[in-house]
Structures are given as structure tokens and as C-alpha cells.
């Protein structure tokens, strides 16, 4: 096989392995992992969830072809002071949340940690309000504690 750039022979394994390692830097997932890009630039700093204080309620218009005002909240994270927008799931879920409430947010579940569906620029969703899950509040199983 003339013209092949790969070394051949009994003792070529080290050279072949190093060559593979060099090429793995062109893979996006490898580069993100090795340079710890998620931990550096993610507002949650690589954690699955984070606590924050609600600054304001906002309505976000959905992308084409849908037409709706999706309810969301602006949240300031406790651990680093960064401000993110978090979607409030469920019918009437925003009614359980007031300004200055403490909420727990998690990723919304979009591809590669990005936004999901017709919500532009929203990467997080609200999971808990004042220590009570939003799901329990909808179903009427628990009352929201007064802080």
C-alpha cells in the first residue's frame, strides 16, 4: 500500500496511538472535556442544579411557527451571582412564584446543554420554589411556605 502515512511493523503501536491522540483534538466533545469548557463557562459551573433568587417574571415569545408567550423568570444564582432566564413549566406555574422567592433550577434538556423547542435562549427550568417541588404545588399536595 504505497503512499500510506501510517507506520507499519511490529513496533509501530506507540506511534499509531500517539497519532490517534493527536487527531482526537479535532473532536468537539474531546476538546470540551480536556479544556474543562463546561465548568469554565456554564453558569451552574458543571453542577446539575443550582439555587437562585427570583428577580422578575418575564414572558418570552416563542419562535416560528409557534405563537405564544412562554412564562419564565430571571434568576440570580446564589453561588456566583450570575443572572439566567429559567422557564416555568406547567399550566399556571408562574402563579406559584413571586419575586424574591428562592428557586432551584436545572437544565431544560436541550441538545448539547442548549435551549429546547421554541424557547430562544432559555437553557434552564424551575424545579423547586422555596424548598417545595413545583410538581407538588400544581397537584395541590403541598402548600408553598411563606418566607
Swiss-Prot record:
The keyword Ribonucleoprotein applies. Coiled coil: none annotated. GO terms for cellular component: small ribosomal subunit. It comes from the Archaea. One of its GO terms (molecular function) is structural constituent of ribosome. InterPro entries: NA-bd_OB-fold, Ribosomal_uS12, Ribosomal_uS12_arc, Ribosomal_uS12_euk/arc. Keywords: Ribonucleoprotein, Ribosomal protein, RNA-binding, rRNA-binding. GO terms for biological process: translation. Pfam families: Ribosom_S12_S23. SUPFAM superfamilies: Nucleic acid-binding proteins. With S4 and S5 plays an important role in translational accuracy. Located at the interface of the 30S and 50S subunits. Part of the 30S ribosomal subunit. Belongs to the universal ribosomal protein uS12 family. This is Small ribosomal subunit protein uS12. It comes from Sulfolobus acidocaldarius (strain ATCC 33909 / DSM 639 / JCM 8929 / NBRC 15157 / NCIMB 11770).
Amino acid at each position: 500500500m504505497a503512499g500510506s502515512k501510517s507506520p507499519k511493523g511490529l513496533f509501530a503501536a506507540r506511534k499509531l496511538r500517539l497519532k490517534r491522540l493527536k487527531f482526537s483534538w479535532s473532536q468537539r466533545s474531546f476538546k470540551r472535556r480536556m479544556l474543562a469548557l463546561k465548568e469554565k463557562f456554564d453558569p451552574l459551573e458543571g453542577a446539575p442544579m443550582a439555587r437562585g433568587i427570583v428577580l422578575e417574571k418575564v414572558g418570552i415569545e416563542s419562535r416560528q411557527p409557534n405563537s405564544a408567550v412562554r412564562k419564565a423568570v430571571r434568576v440570580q444564582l446564589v453561588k456566583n451571582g450570575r443572572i439566567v432566564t429559567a422557564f416555568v413549566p406547567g399550566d399556571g406555574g408562574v402563579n406559584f412564584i413571586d419575586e424574591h422567592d428562592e428557586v432551584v433550577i436545572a437544565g431544560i434538556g436541550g441538545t448539547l446543554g442548549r435551549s429546547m423547542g421554541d424557547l430562544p435562549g432559555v437553557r434552564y427550568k424551575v424545579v423547586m420554589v422555596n424548598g417545595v417541588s413545583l410538581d407538588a404545588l400544581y397537584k395541590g399536595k403541598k402548600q408553598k411556605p411563606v418566607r
